Amino acid sequence: MAAEWHKIIEDVSKNNKFEDAAIVDYKTKKNVLAAIPNRTFAKIIPGEVIALITNRNILKPRIGQKFFIVYTNSLMDENTYTMELLTGYAPVSPIVIARTHTALIFLMGKPTTSRREVYRTCRDYATNVRATGN
């Protein structure tokens, strides 16, 4: 599975529509499994992951020591399994977190990338991973 996580990160880093991405375990250690180095999502800590998956009413979560604003939250819903956010700082960028059976996929678009495109890309990655049982 590790190779698959790194492939997702590699795909995202080659695409100039996205600014940041990470894959984070939410079942056991709640640690970063793969990320674009030296970016915000590479700094995600376990406490931030716990807050995202346990607090359904979270409005302004910290992720990688920065604040974000929740737009929609269906992260723990088995049919949707996504959360949409915006950066809580300028320039405003769209973010989507999608949940697989074992990990969270974080994807941040550039300020010029549409929310819909970030959503579709992130959810597609999660759907493909879910199909493998992970």
Curated annotation (Swiss-Prot):
Record localization: Host cytoplasm
GO BP terms in the entry: actin-dependent intracellular transport of virus towards nucleus; symbiont entry into host cell
GO function terms (MF aspect): actin binding
Keywords: Actin-binding, Actin-dependent inwards viral transport, Cytoplasmic inwards viral transport, Host cytoplasm, Host-virus interaction, Virus entry into host cell
Gene Ontology, cellular component aspect: host cell; host cell cytoplasm
Origin superkingdom: Viruses
InterPro entries according to UniProt: PFN, PFN_euk, PFN_sf
Quaternary structure (record): Interacts with host Tpm1. Interacts with protein A25.
Functional description taken from the UniProt entry: Participates in either intracellular transport of viral proteins or intercellular spread of the virus. Cellular profilins modulate actin filament dynamics (polymerization and depolymerization) via direct binding to actin through an actin-binding domain as well as by modulation of other actin-binding proteins. In contrast to cellular homologs, the poxvirus profilins seem to bind actin only weakly.
Family that this chain belongs to: Belongs to the profilin family.
Protein name stated in the entry: Profilin
Protein's organism: Ectromelia virus (strain Moscow)
